[in-house]
Amino acid sequence: HNNHPRAAGCFSRVLGTYVREKGVLTLNEALAKMTILPARLLESRSPAMARRGRLRAGAAADVTVFDPATISDRSTIEQTWLESVGVHHVLVGGQVVRSAGVTDRSVRPGVPILGGVA
């Protein structure tokens, strides 16, 4: 159990606060920093990362569908479990874990991604 709001609201906070409200990043810049850029950085240590952070045939199909106009984090230090708003669908490895704003907590399709050591 992580007792910090970043556990539940990190990306939603960036998209809602720093992209939409403050305009610090463009949507494309923020999405790249959350997806393709970390995946590319880790590929040399973990070849499985070459299938992450991308939308293309043969990729892992980790996808989040959200509304840029409403996405926002709600978690706090006191209530770290509060889910973000504006996240409609989530697929992990191509399997639906959130549909129409409802999370299916019985589904756990994630897999460990292992890499070599330096």
Predicted regions and their residues:
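Active-site microenvironment of metallo-dependent hydrolases
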Residues: 1-118
